[in-house]
């Protein structure tokens, strides 16, 4: 006896697009100038000249911080000030938000939030990313500045690292947000030369990502060069603060 044919598989639902919700959060955020987020960057050692005209970076006075409770349900830890950054495509389409939660310390300085999970006591990450859908962040970045008139652009991993590289070298910068993001970075169409700032991490992950990006750029006809701090474990921000401390250049 012939078996009845199996029913067709249920088509997978497309991932929910959260862009409208992310845009609403972004549009409620305020300019960086004079905000706790600006004071946080200064506390990290970044001069205002490196970030005061930056694009795609704002301040939110009370951003919710969510975790997952022990039963797997969303758990609100609280509302905190935050530095908010828009993760975009080269054309400016919002793909996600990068959130750095903050708290004030003595002397008017601001630092990354030190919060704990209320049930487990484990530290809660002060930095979080939220994408519009699972595949949205590939190639996207926090495009802090467009390339200059010569088409030159710095690419670094972190936001603070990219701004520090701008302070070090005087060129516009973008933050790829991770080694994976650097390797997959999509440069703006007007880019003619990439200055890739690699973290000098012990795993060499940052250098490998920089090499991958450089090879992609050169294949596409874009000039590329890689800079890396000489000190093991350093990134551009560590190098900026070292030079300020020692008075070297």
Question: What are the language-model segments listed below?
Answer:
Residues 25, 56, 136, 158, ...:
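Residue-level preference for alpha-helix termini and adjacent loops
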Residues 2, 124, 241-243:
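Long, compositionally biased, charged low-complexity segments
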Residues 107, 150-154, 159-249:
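TOPRIM fold recognition
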Residues 22-26, 101, 174, 217:
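Tryptophan-centered motif/residue detector
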Residues 66-189:
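Phosphate-handling DNA/RNA-contact segment within nucleic-acid enzymes
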Residues 15-18, 141-142, 190-192:
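A short alpha-helix capping/helix-coil boundary motif
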Residues 1-83, 88-91, 147:
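TOPRIM metal-binding catalytic domain and adjacent DNA-binding surface shared by DnaG-type primases
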């Amino acid at each position: 006896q012939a078996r009845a044919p199996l029913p067709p598989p249920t088509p997978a639902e497309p991932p929910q697009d959260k862009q409208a919700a992310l845009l609403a959060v972004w549009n409620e955020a305020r300019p960086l100038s004079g905000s706790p987020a600006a004071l946080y960057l200064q506390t990290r050692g970044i001069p205002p000249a490196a970030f005061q005209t930056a694009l795609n970076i704002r301040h939110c006075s009370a951003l919710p911080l969510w975790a997952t409770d022990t039963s797997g349900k969303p758990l609100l830890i609280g509302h905190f000030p935050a530095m908010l950054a828009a993760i975009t495509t080269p054309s400016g389409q919002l793909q996600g938000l990068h959130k750095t939660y903050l708290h004030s310390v003595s002397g008017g300085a601001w630092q990354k939030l030190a919060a704990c999970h209320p049930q487990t006591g484990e530290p809660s990450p002060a930095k979080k990313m939220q994408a519009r859908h699972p595949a949205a962040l590939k190639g996207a970045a926090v495009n802090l500045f467009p390339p200059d008139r010569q088409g030159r652009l710095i690419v670094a991993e972190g936001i603070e690292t990219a701004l520090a590289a701008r302070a070090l070298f005087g060129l516009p910068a973008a933050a790829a947000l991770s080694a994976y993001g650097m390797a997959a970075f999509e440069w703006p169409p007007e880019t003619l030369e990439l200055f890739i700032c690699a973290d000098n991490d012990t795993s060499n992950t940052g250098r490998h990502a920089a090499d991958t990006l450089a090879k992609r750029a050169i294949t596409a006809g874009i000039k590329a060069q890689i800079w890396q701090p000489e000190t093991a474990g350093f990134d551009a921000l560590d190098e900026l603060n070292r030079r300020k401390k020692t008075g070297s250049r």
